[in-house]
UniProtKB/Swiss-Prot annotation:
Residues bearing PTM Phosphohistidine: H250
Cytoplasmic side: 1-11, 187-467
InterPro entries reported for this sequence: 2-comp_sensor_kinase, HAMP_dom, HATPase_C_sf, His_kinase_dom, HisK_dim/P_dom, HisK_dim/P_sf, Sig_transdc_His_kin-like_C
Result of changing E264K: Increased expression of periplasmic chaperone Spy
Catalytic activity: ATP + protein L-histidine = ADP + protein N-phospho-L-histidine
GO MF, one example: phosphorelay sensor kinase activity
Protein name: Signal transduction histidine-protein kinase BaeS
Source organism of the structure: Escherichia coli (strain K12)
Pfam family, one: HisKA
Enzyme Commission number: 2.7.13.3
Alphabetical GO biological process terms: cellular response to cell envelope stress; signal transduction
Species classification: Bacteria, Pseudomonadati, Pseudomonadota, Gammaproteobacteria, Enterobacterales
Amino acid sequence: MKFWRPGITGKLFLAIFATCIVLLISMHWAVRISFERGFIDYIKHGNEQRLQLLSDALGEQYAQHGNWRFLRNNDRFVFQILRSFEHDNSEDKPGPGMPPHGWRTQFWVVDQNNKVLVGPRAPIPPDGTRRPILVNGAEVGAVIASPVERLTRNTDINFDKQQRQTSWLIVALATLLAALATFLLARGLLAPVKRLVDGTHKLAAGDFTTRVTPTSEDELGKLAQDFNQLASTLEKNQQMRRDFMADISHELRTPLAVLRGELEAIQDGVRKFTPETVASLQAEVGTLTKLVDDLHQLSMSDEGALAYQKAPVDLIPLLEVAGGAFRERFASRGLKLQFSLPDSITVFGDRDRLMQLFNNLLENSLRYTDSGGSLQISAGQRDKTVRLTFADSAPGVSDDQLQKLFERFYRTEGSRNRASGGSGLGLAICLNIVEAHNGRIIAAHSPFGGVSITVELPLERDLQREV
């Protein structure tokens, strides 16, 4: 047997509505109890006033007659006195189970010896309200009223019944209004959630163009903004993945096509299998190997899988070693390699990965700088940051191209292209290495007409404190 399981809208509605019902019923009973107690106190106060009036009136009559004979067997006389100041209640009919004269169950008139002159035959309650009848300061009798523990007069009972019915009617109307308000409130509060749920389903189905419109500035509005950011990131990653696969296919196609052409030429007898042919094939295989290695390094750096063994590292000897390894290659192309370095700058990092960073930057300038140019490497520190600058000479790039230099497989047109032999992954790997060291890498126009790559890294003491 399946039971109804409410959704989040139903649960929110039930929670708010149940709270409203509990509050309404609690308030109703609190008001009822307060009303009944207050009403009984009001009746008690009225009885006390009637007792006092009756006591004063009987005292005047006693002073005129000098005794209580006028009152014996004359209950109607007391009734007439009460009727004189209680016109509204004089026509009331006795309640159920009460004698014809309902007032007799409430009042007794006794003389100075506590002998009952007027009143019911029932015993006088010891906790009744007593008002003495005074004549010239002497007590000649008393008027006694039974304690009020419940409503006995029809007027009071009917009034209490009417108030009870009215209060329940108010509770019923308030319940309907609470249900309507709760329903509208639940729908209003959960409408953004429903839009987010629908958007999530679309994202799960692969529609990364889905966006939701934030309708408030609260937590749900912030969640909608985060959802849109997530969708935008997924859409961007999807496009990058497509471009990445297309770029890989393109990069692999050229060396494979050359290899295939060379092998088919040898197979058809067009070319002879000579050492020169073997060298050509090895060059293409080397290109493929370099591309695969770069892809492997990039994928590991993307996932943070590169093993970073961080320790205090002096960058100056590291730069000098890297520059020394490239000096002969720079000279063979007619390029000048110049350094402007301080004696020592220490950072907290991985020596091997920093060497890989410098090698990639040197390789980038070597491949893409025109012959007869130069590369200026400078270093310094400002505040708590180490700044390394690799500024080469022409050719330069446009402002738009500067923003794309660190994208994988990106190459500029002109002399900075595939003809130079690069895979377009070196600067992307540099970006990952720098970010792994809590730094940043920036491309700008070089004062020498080429490109200036600036690497900013935290000083050794700041990074070590963070670790």
